[in-house]
Structure formats: structure tokens, C-alpha cells
């Protein structure tokens, strides 16, 4: 393979479809905007999947999807989910599956962040008062 052909293959190599000298894409990403039937506002969806060329299965190992759907309020609700499937043995059909929904954990994460911010603010206030007290005490000790 000469340099010109190699450059053409590398030039085709992009973040959205990576060939790596293979006819099947290893990494694909797609975007689409849809208008929901209930409202005229567009819904943004994004999906991402990887397919290793060494496995014979046509099912992707890792899938991630995002969608933003407008609710009855003015702010859009962002829903994010992820799932991972990993083959235990390439010859068998048994696979381990891990899935989670981040929108369910959003409330607990927000609560934890809010509590940490309050705690940080109270610690800063206590330290500020202690430093102020020491400065005033030192000032009165020097004046006497």
C-alpha cells in the first residue's frame, strides 16, 4: 500500500465512522431530530454503539442513547440511559448485562450536592468567625 492510498484510508477515518482497514465500521454515532405528535417542539435523540470486528455477533457491545423531550413545563427534561453487554465467552451465547437509568439517580445526586454545599458554606462561616475573633483578640492584646 503506497502513501497516497494510506492517506485516503486515514482521511476517511473520522469520529463518526472508523474503518481501520476493515469494511465494517467499528464506531458509529447517529443524530436525529423528531417532532413529537403531542407538540410541535423537536425532540433531540442521539445514539452511539460500538461493534468489535473480532466478534461474530452483530449486536453491539455498548449502547448509549440520549433524548430530550419537552414536558408540560417550559424547561425540557433530559433523559439519559446507558447499557453495557459484555460477552463472557465468545463461543457461548451467555452475556452479562448491566443497565442503569441516570434520571432515577438525579434526585439523590442533587440532594447530596446541595448538602455538601451547605456543609462547605457553614465550615467557611465558622473559619471566618474564628479568624476574625483571633485578629480582634491579637489587636486588643497588642493595644494593652
Swiss-Prot record:
Residues 30-58 have a biased composition (Low complexity). Coiled coil: none annotated. It is a single-pass membrane protein. One of its GO terms (cellular component) is plasma membrane. The chain crosses the membrane at residues 42-58. Residues 68-84 have a biased composition (Polar residues). One of its GO terms (biological process) is negative regulation of cell population proliferation. Residues 30-89 are annotated as: Disordered. Belongs to the DVL/RTFL small polypeptides family. This is Small polypeptide DEVIL 18.
Amino acid at each position: 500500500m503506497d502513501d497516497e492510498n494510506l492517506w485516503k484510508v486515514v482521511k476517511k477515518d473520522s469520529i463518526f465512522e472508523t474503518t481501520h482497514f476493515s469494511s465494517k465500521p467499528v464506531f458509529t454515532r447517529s443524530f436525529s431530530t423528531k417532532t413529537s405528535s403531542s407538540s410541535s417542539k423537536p425532540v433531540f435523540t442521539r445514539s452511539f454503539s460500538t461493534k468489535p470486528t473480532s466478534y461474530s455477533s452483530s449486536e453491539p457491545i455498548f449502547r448509549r442513547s440520549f433524548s430530550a423531550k419537552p414536558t408540560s413545563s417550559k424547561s425540557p427534561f433530559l433523559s439519559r440511559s446507558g447499557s453495557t453487554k459484555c460477552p463472557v465467552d465468545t463461543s457461548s451465547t451467555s452475556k452479562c448485562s448491566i443497565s442503569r437509568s441516570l434520571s432515577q439517580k438525579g434526585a439523590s445526586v442533587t440532594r447530596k450536592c446541595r448538602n455538601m454545599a451547605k456543609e462547605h458554606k457553614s465550615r467557611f462561616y465558622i473559619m471566618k468567625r474564628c479568624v476574625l475573633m483571633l485578629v480582634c483578640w491579637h489587636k486588643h492584646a497588642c493595644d494593652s
